[in-house]
């Protein structure tokens, strides 16, 4: 196990951010249970990557954003990844995710961060307000992975989080500027 990764989980209020984490990590979320508004919370989980290595991930569960509120500045420092959550039964929550992605892009200081997007409540088909094709098209144009999930089906949560942990902890690829002993010239600055 390497370093602990920091992941910020964010989205509009009442889209299921805390429920997703509770179900993923503990398997104990009861659908329909009373919702308690989150101020800010930290969850620590151990996720097996696609390489078979267990990695520790610290999830920063943020307060649901309302009425144009922005993500607090501290959410951008030293962050390795983001989970942006919207509810498939709320077009407004999807639009909030679009804005959050732009905010992250402006604030990440050229640092490589992994972003996954979750469309929660996909089991509520009759209440759907976000077209899955539109959402996938947006995700593709933004170069992020998007999954539709349901807290009621814990298995639907596994793939996105395995992907996230795997991507954040993958070994560094070879440098684009390999150091080679076969230099042209001597490298001397003497005339």
Curated annotation (Swiss-Prot):
Question: Where would you find the membrane-spanning parts of this chain?
Answer: none
PROSITE patterns, per the entry = RAB
List the GO biological process terms.
Answer: inflammatory response; lung alveolus development; negative regulation of canonical NF-kappaB signal transduction; Ral protein signal transduction; regulation of tumor necrosis factor-mediated signaling pathway; surfactant homeostasis
**SUPFAM superfamilies documented for this protein:** P-loop containing nucleoside triphosphate hydrolases
Entry keywords, A to Z: Cytoplasm, GTP-binding, Nucleotide-binding
What residue spans carry the region label Disordered? 169-191
GO MF terms held by the record? GTP binding; GTPase activating protein binding; GTPase activity
Compartment annotation:
Cytoplasm
Q: Which Pfam families match?
A: Ras
Q: Which GO terms describe its cellular component?
A: cytoplasm
Q: Where is this region: Small GTPase-like?
A: 1-191
- Short motif (Effector region): ranges: 35-43
Q: What is its main location?
A: cytoplasm
Q: Which InterPro entries match?
A: KBRS, P-loop_NTPase, Small_GTP-bd, Small_GTPase
Q: Where does GTP bind?
A: 11-18, 61-65, 120-123
Name the tissues where it is expressed.
Answer: Widely expressed.
Q: Which family does it belong to?
A: Belongs to the small GTPase superfamily. Ras family. KappaB-Ras subfamily.
Domain description from the entry? In contrast to other members of the Ras family, the members of the KappaB-Ras subfamily do not contain the conserved Gly and Gln residues in positions 13 and 65, which are replaced by Ala and Leu residues, respectively, and are therefore similar to the constitutively active forms of oncogenic forms of Ras. This suggests that members of this family are clearly different from other small GTPases proteins.
- NCBIfam families annotated for this entry? small_GTP
Q: How does it assemble?
A: Interacts with both NF-kappa-B inhibitor alpha (NFKBIA) and beta (NFKBIB) in vitro. However, it probably only interacts with NFKBIB in vivo. Interacts with GFOD1.
Tell me, in a sentence or two, what this protein's role is.
Atypical Ras-like protein that acts as a potent regulator of NF-kappa-B activity by preventing the degradation of NF-kappa-B inhibitor beta (NFKBIB) by most signals, explaining why NFKBIB is more resistant to degradation. May act by blocking phosphorylation of NFKBIB and nuclear localization of p65/RELA NF-kappa-B subunit. It is unclear whether it acts as a GTPase. Both GTP- and GDP-bound forms block phosphorylation of NFKBIB.
The entry's protein name is NF-kappa-B inhibitor-interacting Ras-like protein 2
């Amino acid at each position: 196990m390497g370093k602990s990764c920091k992941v910020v989980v964010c989205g509009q209020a009442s889209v299921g951010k805390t429920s997703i984490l509770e179900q993923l990590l503990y398997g104990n979320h009861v659908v329909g249970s009373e919702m308690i508004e989150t101020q800010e919370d930290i969850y620590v989980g151990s996720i097996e990557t696609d390489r078979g290595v267990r990695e520790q991930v610290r999830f920063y569960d943020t307060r649901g954003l309302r009425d144009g509120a922005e993500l607090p500045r501290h959410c951008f420092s030293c962050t390795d990844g983001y989970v942006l959550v919207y509810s498939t039964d709320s077009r407004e929550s999807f639009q909030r995710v679009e804005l959050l992605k732009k905010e992250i892009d402006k604030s990440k200081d050229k640092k490589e961060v992994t972003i996954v997007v979750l469309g929660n409540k996909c089991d509520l088909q009759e209440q759907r307000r976000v077209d899955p094709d539109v959402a996938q098209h947006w995700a593709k144009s933004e170069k992020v992975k998007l999954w539709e999930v349901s807290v009621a089906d814990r298995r639907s949560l596994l793939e996105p989080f395995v992907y996230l942990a795997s991507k954040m902890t993958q070994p560094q690829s070879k440098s684009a500027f390999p150091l080679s002993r076969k230099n042209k010239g001597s490298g001397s600055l003497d005339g």
